[in-house]
Amino acid sequence: MDEEETAEINAQEQEVAGSAGEAAAGPSGAEVQPNDDSVAVERVIDVFEETAEMEAAMIERFFGPSGEVAEEGTLPVPGPSADGEGSANAGGERPSEEDIVLDDGTESDGSYNRPGSDMSLDSPNSEDDSDVEAMPRWMIPQNRLRFAVDMMVSQARNQDGGIAALLNRDNFLQRVRSMVFSQERRRSRNSDEVSPEAEDDELPEHPPPPPPRPPIDIDMEEGVHFDTNLPAEHSYFGPNLNRVPGVNYQEVGSTHHMLIFLHQYILFPGEVLPFMIDGSLFDDDMSGLDGLIFAVAFPLMKPPEDSKKLYGVTCQIYEKGDNGRHLTFYKSRALQRIVINCSDIKGLPQYIARNPTNKCHSKVKILPEYFLPEPLKCIDMGSMSRFRDIPSMRDKYLRYQISSTPWPVEVCQEYAYEDIVERARKKLEVHKIDTMPKCPIQMSFWLVRNLHLTEKMMSQMFLTDSVNLRLQLIGGILKEETLFYCRYCNSSLAYCSDLFAMSKHGVQTQYCNPGGYIHETNTVYRVISHAIGYSGEPSTRFSWFPGYQWHIILCKFCAQHVGWEFKAVEPNLAPKVFYGLAGSSVRIGKAGDSATVNGNNFVVRNMLRVISEGME
């Protein structure tokens, strides 16, 4: 593979890395309108450009060219136009706290004060106001501007449309200034009431995360429980699917020449990968009735010290069907981990979720799975072995075994995994999951997908050849409380403790929409209050969960697509409502993560940058 093809592959990787949750976001392929920060920024800049001439006229009218106040003691508030039309404050009077009302009808409460924020005017960490008097009166100090924008962002959080709707409203600059003057008046009113001791109190750097909520018990809901076998069958592909026999595992360490594709998510052996593709790419390679084995590589999981290799899995097709549009539905299952040398790739590999048109082949090597059984279970103690399965004698028997071996207790426990499996089983009982495999190799991969680890941990698990080490790593994170965060603004969306299985494969499953885009979906009972908004209308077309309608949900802060709400349309179906979070739009993080809890800092920082540029 030459340098030109390598450069094109890297370009595709960057495109996928930056396009998580792209246009084909709905199960039916319905597009979510782009609503990213760049669009909001352009909107704010347009507002400033439209009011540039008005700003200059008002400054000269009220203050004069030098910025001096025309009349001592009066601080005018500019209106939406140079002549003051449409503004209640065109006469130059400063609005009172009670009169400040945002365009969405939300009143500005003068008592707003975000604890621990570095944007607070009364905080010891706020910017120095010593140079405020030296500035022209019509200029807004940076710390007051920051506090006003922070307040507007917090109020917009509880309104439909989120931050994008806030930026798209008219008179944005006027509302920012009104908020500043309202807070200034409140500050002067309360300055005498604040004691010196209170000012010296240090506040926490970040507001605490919302407290965990009590778990929902689906067994208490009335109605017929949803059949978790239905999503696993991917029945939304239609009834015209034919079973393809044959499951072939390749010998460990062997090298094979096979068709390869790229994928934006990490697949572990045992997972099902549904996709839609031009059948002509497979017809020539499928021999008889045996299922085709092909390779799927993960370019976003390149180890930094080994960038010339790609890691992935082999997949075997076990079901296929025609959709009548020159495309073929396929269902495949991941079998074994593989490694690919980039120099062995013949052709340009394409993403399997983007309707590939060209074939690409390469040599792949099957990676091993090393598993060492528990040392004490390998010791045959003759007639005493019968005490191993007696609960009352198990501990005594274990101590006797350890005393008769040359290894210390730590060595024996290092390779013990039954305790880890039991703790994982108890944790997953909350999620109503009872499909844990018994084979240690398959169980290690299954636990990685259902315990919801961070992306870094998942990559580490995939690259580990030792099953024992993989289980030890899993045991180390069982007690950690984790949340789903928006990948774009770090706003907290849902608790991982609210996960539950709507599919027999677990809480995280991959689904395909009619556009061919593959979504990794995490099902949760509920999301954090005021964390989401909605886009478009609900629909039952191509629903991944039969009997439920889907509705696109957006992050309330950044208005980016983060998943779907599923609501039962058939009577007596339980659960009545649940949510599917798109893996491309969310990330897993610890509850005490240093990242922003509610996304305020991210949004405020970008809004302040644009406002500052517009006021220069």
Swiss-Prot record:
Ubiquitinated. InterPro entries: CULT, Lon_prtase_N, Yippee/Mis18/Cereblon. Residues 206-215 have a biased composition (Pro residues). This is Protein cereblon. PROSITE patterns: CULT, LON_N. Gene3D superfamilies: 1.20.58.1480, Peptide methionine sulfoxide reductase. Residues 481-590 form the CULT domain. GO terms for molecular function: metal ion binding. The lineage of its organism: Eukaryota, Metazoa, Ecdysozoa, Arthropoda, Hexapoda. The gene is ohgt. It comes from Drosophila persimilis (Fruit fly). Substrate recognition component of a DCX (DDB1-CUL4-X-box) E3 protein ligase complex that mediates the ubiquitination and subsequent proteasomal degradation of target proteins. Has an essential role in mediating growth by negatively regulating insulin signaling. It also has a role in maintaining presynaptic function in the neuromuscular junction synapses of third-instar larvae. GO terms for cellular component: nucleus.
